[in-house]
Amino acid sequence: MAVKIRLARGGAKKRPFYRVVVANATAPRDGDFLEKVGTYNPMLASDNSERVVLKKDRIEYWLGTGAKPTERVAKFIEQAGVTLPEKVKKEMEVKAKNRKVRPSKKEAKEA
């Protein structure tokens, strides 16, 4: 079973709140999950300590068992001070390198 560490959306319309969960890769975004390992509240100020709350010990455990974080969650994990496995870092670099940079609407209009 492939396992991912990803965000599951909650909250009301226009008021998002996310749980950082460990879930089966084929499960729906907001469906069943194995464990809740943190929260992310984008409505709080970026300097607020409760904007991203992670259980570091449980994340380290799941990374050790082979769970792969999504790009956004990987950024949160690195900011929290947890080291990602080399394999995950390489995959993120490859994705970033292959990502196409599209011009903004304003730039496209001027060209």
From Swiss-Prot:
One biological process term in Gene Ontology: translation
GO molecular function, one term: structural constituent of ribosome
Gene Ontology cellular component list: cytoplasm; small ribosomal subunit
Source organism, top-level taxon: Bacteria
Keywords: Ribonucleoprotein, Ribosomal protein
Pfam families the UniProt entry points to: Ribosomal_S16 (PF00886)
PROSITE patterns: RIBOSOMAL_S16 (PS00732)
Family stated for the protein in its record: Belongs to the bacterial ribosomal protein bS16 family.
Name of this chain's protein: Small ribosomal subunit protein bS16
Record organism: Rickettsia felis (strain ATCC VR-1525 / URRWXCal2)
